[in-house]
């Protein structure tokens, strides 16, 4: 009997994937996922139309997370642009690189962003609602109650498992466990990803 391993991905960041996969995808590329296909959105108008449609869904007291924005296709992003479309629906537009995100005022209020705490060099532009690189950490710490909510994070890990198997991978690795919350991530990763499947 010959056993051949599947693909190995040593740089997947399971926690990052578990956070992203439950989000609404609005991307310039087509995504074929086990639970459906996401058609590409390749211009600012299309992005705004999709954001407008998403802003009317879900509970009013829950932030809307949109992943996949990129300025080359979707144009410049800002707090004002989000507010012109999503109004007072708390909305987070996460860049496809994962290294930056934008929030409208409703989202910043909901998660407790305090303008007086923002100092020069923090890589945060409060007027644009833009949190990038180091400033992303500030935003993530405030978004954790939503992105790491046990049911949402567990659902993201289950989606990750589906995606990994869908792509023919049998082994994944991560060098960034703990980027959100080490103990919560380690426990959930062990519970949902360890095992025979």
Task: List PLM regions with ranges.
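Divalent metal-binding segments
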Residues: 1-196
